[in-house]
A protein has these predicted regions:
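N-terminal signal peptide c-region/cleavage motif recognized by signal peptidases
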Residues: 17-18
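A short, hydrophobic C-terminal helix/tail in secreted or cell-surface proteins
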Residues: 189-207
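A domain-level signal for the mature, folded cores of soluble proteins
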Residues: 23-118, 122-185
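Bacterial N-terminal signal peptides that target proteins for export
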Residues: 1-8, 191-192
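Hydrophobic helical h-region of N-terminal Sec-dependent signal peptides
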Residues: 10-14, 200
């Protein structure tokens, strides 16, 4: 009997903890709160119509935090540009229903479209299609090629053809990328390319200060 009571108490505590961690962010409830959002910039190839504070890819990491008064907190894709990020303390997975699993927070007065893809390994990609909205929710369960229960660590956003806005915030401006349907973290490889990309960001920052 005591064992049964302990089991019930433990189960109740777990349910309370999960419910307590659910956090409304940008008007959308993320069950896992802050850890739901992308943590790592894998690659960033901006178009020519991006400059100033809008070409910092790390601005797309973490929870949405764009500050319109100082125009900081978002990164622009630019014409033909792309951004690839990864989840390191969680992953994106299916939900088993028609609700949005992946949410992309895009900012600005213009609602600009972009292509969204996901991957388990940063090599083989599944196209989720062209989307737009502020923010945009995508039901990955409805996408051909997405496997039930698969854990996706990578998200790639690519500008769609056509000029949607100009310098310095060309095309879609990304504030955050979050997984509502969040699975456990998957260990990611650390290829040399990641290190070289990080070095490139450091050199870019140094050159701006001169």
């Amino acid at each position: 009997m005591i064992s049964l009571v302990r089991t019930i108490v433990a189960s109740t505590s777990l349910l309370v903890a999960v419910h307590a961690s659910a956090t409304p962010i940008g008007g959308i409830e993320f069950p896992q709160g802050a850890i739901s959002f992308a943590d790592l910039v894998v690659s960033y190839m901006p178009g020519s119509d991006v400059g100033g504070t809008y070409m910092g890819p790390a601005e797309a990491l973490g929870m949405p935090d764009y500050n319109d008064s100082v125009q900081e907190g978002a990164v622009s894709l630019g014409k033909g540009g792309s951004l690839t990020v990864a989840f390191t303390d969680n992953s994106l997975t299916t939900s088993g229903d028609s609700a949005g699993d992946l949410w992309v927070f895009e900012i600005g007065s213009a609602v600009e479209s972009f292509q969204v893809e996901i991957s388990t390994n940063n090599v083989n990609w599944i196209d989720l299609g062209f989307v737009l909205g502020q923010p945009t929710g995508i039901d990955i369960d409805a996408i051909a090629g997405v496997n039930v229960g698969e854990l996706y660590s990578y998200v790639r956003l690519t500008d769609t053809p056509g000029n949607q806005s100009g310098f310095p915030y060309g095309e879609a401006d990304i504030d955050a990328i979050g997984a509502i349907s969040s699975g456990h973290a998957v260990p990611l490889p650390a290829p040399a390319g990641f290190a070289l990309f990080g070095l490139g960001l450091i050199l870019l920052a140094v050159s701006r200060r001169r």
